[in-house]
Amino acid sequence: MIITIDGPAGAGKSSIARRVASELGFEFLDTGAMYRAVTWGVMQQGIAWDDVESLVEFADAAQLIWQDDRIYLDNQDISEEIRTPQVTSHIRYLADPPRIRERITAQQRRIATGRDIVTEGRDQGTEVFPDAHCKIFLTASPEERARRRQRQLAENGRVMSVEEILAAQNQRDLEDRMRPVGRLRAASDAIVVQTDGMSPDEVREEVLRLVRECVQASAANSASSDVTR
């Protein structure tokens, strides 16, 4: 079974997806780690960022494995190596070009085959797993997301005004909605969860409730299909 959780930056998708996966006994698929892994591999190979053909070729040949919350590239565990600022600053070269994104999307589908997965992003329910059993679109107002981000930064010793965060966030939202491939949008069959004023625990419980309803409905449909055969 595949459960997708999409939404804008700052909506809390990653933390909620991990908690939901843990509660259900599912695996959490960190699709961002996959883009980071390919980015790291490109850096190790010294491929130029403007050499799109070579980038596509590398993404096509890369052997990605996601196991026990660890990411492997060509059988090498690089789960720590991909979390550097250098990798972060270059992800866009792999995440934006449509041809490269298609290759990594194919790898995500391959990894998810036959597994119970919770995955999050901005296009998981629309582009990557359009036939997912349950699709959640997690969102909040721009102001709410900016306040949450400010609190997260403060916990790590960084100080930024809500206004600064909001301006950067609005720009990213605009860019994410305008992307030619994998743009930010709710799938037509996604359940939209508006989280303004909700605590992380309240969001988790609401998402779990919705997911369990999806699981029950899926089981009922499967049983009905078996009866009619």
Swiss-Prot record:
Segments passing through the bilayer: none
Cellular location(s): Cytoplasm
Molecular functions (GO terms): (d)CMP kinase activity; ATP binding; CMP kinase activity; dCMP kinase activity
EC code: 2.7.4.25
GO cellular component assignments: cytosol
CDD domains: CMPK (cd02020)
Catalysed reactions listed for this entry: CMP + ATP = CDP + ADP; dCMP + ATP = dCDP + ADP
A GO BP entry: nucleobase-containing small molecule interconversion
Residue positions binding ATP: 7-15
Alphabetical UniProt keywords: ATP-binding, Cytoplasm, Kinase, Nucleotide-binding, Transferase
PANTHER family: CYTIDYLATE KINASE, CYTIDYLATE KINASE/PANTOATE-BETA-ALANINE LIGASE
Family indicated by similarity: Belongs to the cytidylate kinase family. Type 1 subfamily.
This protein's name: Cytidylate kinase
Origin species: Rhodopirellula baltica (strain DSM 10527 / NCIMB 13988 / SH1)
Gene that this sequence comes from: cmk
